[in-house]
Design a protein with these regions (language model features):
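N-terminal recruitment modules of adaptor/scaffold proteins
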Residues: 1-57
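Short, compact, well-ordered microdomains
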Residues: 53-81
Length: 81
């Protein structure tokens, strides 16, 4: 199961699991080249990307940049090395 499927499962699985999720992405230039996105900042789960509200603007992040997905403090998906 890839990151898109995991995020959709969190979104449609009931409750507010996607809103409580933390998604770590590859973000060149950020400390450690990583950035954490809160589930509450996800505006849309598209076919090849997620649309996210960032402090500056809305941005499109391709799923292949996702490194890890956490839900309720547990890692539910991690990119293989």
């Amino acid at each position: 199961m890839g990151p898109r499927e995991v995020l959709n499962k969190l979104k449609w699985g009931g409750g507010e699991n996607l809103r409580k999720a933390k998604i770590t992405i590859l973000h060149r230039g950020a400390p450690g080249d990583k950035r954490v996105i809160e589930g509450t900042d996800i505006l849309e789960l598209g076919r090849g990307f997620m649309r996210v509200l960032s402090p500056e603007e809305e941005v499109y992040i391709p799923y292949h940049r996702i490194l890890r997905i956490e839900a309720s403090g547990l890692v539910v998906w991690k990119k293989s090395d």
